[in-house]
Each structure stands twice: as C-alpha cells, then as structure tokens.
Amino acid sequence: MQNKSWLRHSQRIAVKMLEKMDELSMTQKQLANMMGGSQQYVSKVLKGQENLSLETMSKIEDCLHISILQEEIEMA
C-alpha cells in the first residue's frame, strides 16, 4: 500500500486556505496573482489533492497570513 499521509496534510491545508480566503473575500484568481501562479493551480491545491512543495506552502502562508508549516509539524 502506498503511503498517502501527504494527502491528509494537503486536505487540511486546503481547508485552512478556504476558510481564510472566505474570511478575506478572496478569489482563487486573486490568490493566484499574489502567488505568481495560475488560477488552475490554486484550484488544484484547494481540492486538497496536490503534493505541495515547501516553496508553495511558504507562498500560501505569506499571501494569506496563515501558519501552515508549523501547525503541520506539530500535528505530525
């Protein structure tokens, strides 16, 4: 059986992102522009099925002013 623990983390990150985006009334397109990426990629991330790089997680943290990495380390 393949280890998919990253999928569980990715889904938690997606939920946190969606909550913050809702709080900020931020669209996927707006977040993509801030991150320097595409709306399509942000959509994939928000589905919780994207294996995120540290660089991407850092960009998300900076753009949404949330902590992802520290919380995921504490939950591991």
Language model: regions and residue ranges:
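Short, charged recognition helix plus adjacent turn
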Residues: S25, Q70-A76
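Residues that mark the N-terminal boundary/hinge immediately upstream of a DNA-recognition element
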Residues: T27, S53-T56
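Short alpha-helical DNA-recognition segment
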Residues: S25-S43
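DNA major-groove recognition helix of helix-turn-helix/homeodomain DNA-binding modules
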Residues: E55-Q70
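N-terminal flexible/basic segments that precede or flank functional cores
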Residues: M1-E19, L24
